[in-house]
Amino acid sequence: PTVSLVLGGGHSIGIPLAVSAQKSFIAPSASMMIHPVRTCGVVVGSPVTYHYFQRIQEQITDFVTENSHISREKFTEYMMATGQIATDVGTIVYGKEAVESGLIDRLGGLHDALETLHRMIEKQHKTGGGNKTHKNYRNLRSGML
């Protein structure tokens, strides 16, 4: 079982990391910056370079939309928005909006994330899976880990 929690800022590659868990949480005051793939410094402006970045962006978009409940259209809209970030494109979303858009599963904090993880472990144990996980869970609950 996996649970993620965004407490401060889940920017850039933090978004795919957050949605990769089975359940994701975000604190109400936490933010996430959604923007397209880009680079800094000197880049040769060739069609090959452009195509490379386009392929990377497609992979990231596919991963995020397949591992969350946000639509491809909404994610792309956030990513390509102008007017929010002074010198760039993208969108900053905060806790409630991240949940309402389907990017993150629930609002919550550390307690909520740990309680959910504990319930997931218990459920896995009851269905016969993960004996080693359950032993580690019992040790964690009793303060041995």
Regions found by a protein language model. Give the residues of each.
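N-terminal organellar transit peptides
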Residues: 1-15, 20-145
